[in-house]
Amino acid sequence: MYKKILLPTDGSSYADQEVERVKNILAEDGEVIVLSVAGLLTSSAFQSRKKVKKVNDKLKKDAQRYVDNMAAKFDDDVKVTKMVVRGFPSDAINEVANNEGVDLIVISSTGKSGLHRFVLGSVTEKVLKNSEVDVLLVHNE
């Protein structure tokens, strides 16, 4: 049984599978950290700062919604910490895992469909390669 589990989410439809896995392996007095990494768009010569801020605000709002939706799938007696951070997903996931002292990262084998599926699959691969803690890979059905 694991006492502190990091559960990253990208808002994909596989959350139920991941949550069920966590429920089965979380210690009775354990904690789950539900994390979403909001991308960060930087301004360029082609985009106004106002537009960039608007996009970044939407990315953060979406990430918060993903975290809230996944956290709501746990029973009230489970300690759930919700986090939204900015950065590159694989780096941010491993950084949070190290900083928060988690025992396990539970992550989906793929994320959203289309191009996102390819990109998030590579995020999973980088987390697996660079993690300093155990990683449970949930194959999507």
Model-derived regions, located:
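Short conserved AdoMet
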Residues: L26-A27, D75, E132
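Gly/Ser-rich helix-loop-strand patches that form or flank binding pockets
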Residues: N98-E141
